[in-house]
Amino acid sequence: MPIKPGEEVIFTVPIRKIKKIVPRWKRAPRAVKFVREFVARHAKAQEVIISTKVNEKIWERGIEKPPSRLRVKVKVEEEDRDGKKVRIAYVDLA
């Protein structure tokens, strides 16, 4: 069941899943992409906007050691663009 517009939900993103797949020196950038994909999939959103706080938390310990999991607060809103409804998910630290 998708998140309703205006509703806030807290997700725990399992960043640990990418650690075996991605080389050490690509982990933090790939973790940001993973958070974006995870939220888009679970919130059924076409666009995902990640706050700078989430980005800084991922990069806090450098490029090689992102956190194993991250609790994020997701708020979904709908916009009209050219007559089509677009779901946008805003991601912030929980």
Swiss-Prot record:
Belongs to the eukaryotic ribosomal protein eL31 family. It comes from the Archaea. SUPFAM superfamilies: Ribosomal protein L31e. GO terms for biological process: cytoplasmic translation. CDD domains: Ribosomal_L31e (cd00463). InterPro entries: Ribosomal_eL31 (IPR000054), Ribosomal_eL31_CS (IPR020052), Ribosomal_eL31_dom_sf (IPR023621). It holds the Pfam family Ribosomal_L31e. Keywords: Ribonucleoprotein, Ribosomal protein. GO terms for molecular function: structural constituent of ribosome. One of its GO terms (cellular component) is cytosolic large ribosomal subunit. This is Large ribosomal subunit protein eL31. The gene is rpl31e. It comes from Pyrococcus abyssi (strain GE5 / Orsay).
